Amino acid sequence: MPNTIELSFHVKRHTDFELLRIIKAQEQGFEEPVTAFLCGVAIRARTGIGIVFGHKREDQYGRFGDGHLIRTSDVIKAEREGRFWVLTTVNSRYVIATFQRGNGRASLREFLRLSQGMHHFTPRVLQ
């Protein structure tokens, strides 16, 4: 018996509706390259939180793999491109395929309201 350890990380399967929205987003095309597509998104503390699909930096260990929960770095701007919202961070662009039920869209509206003219990013080092 080999000495192997198998780790299973929490993974959420995408629903048919989410996959359909992702396909529509991929078909639409975007002005700049997209890092990943996110489902079930809510914005909390200037970061996007959702379930990732098609991340460009997925590695051999499953980091950023489809179905994994992701917390983006600070969102610099959120704007609508065609039928979809795009979250832009320092190094990435995430397309929102679906919002979290109940408070996802409300969190985007709140982010847009609070971020107008105010850019107070998370400090790199806490004192």
Indicate where each model-derived feature is located.
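N-terminal non-globular leader segments, chiefly Sec-dependent signal peptides
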Residues: 1-76, 115-127
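Short, compact, well-ordered microdomains
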Residues: 76-120
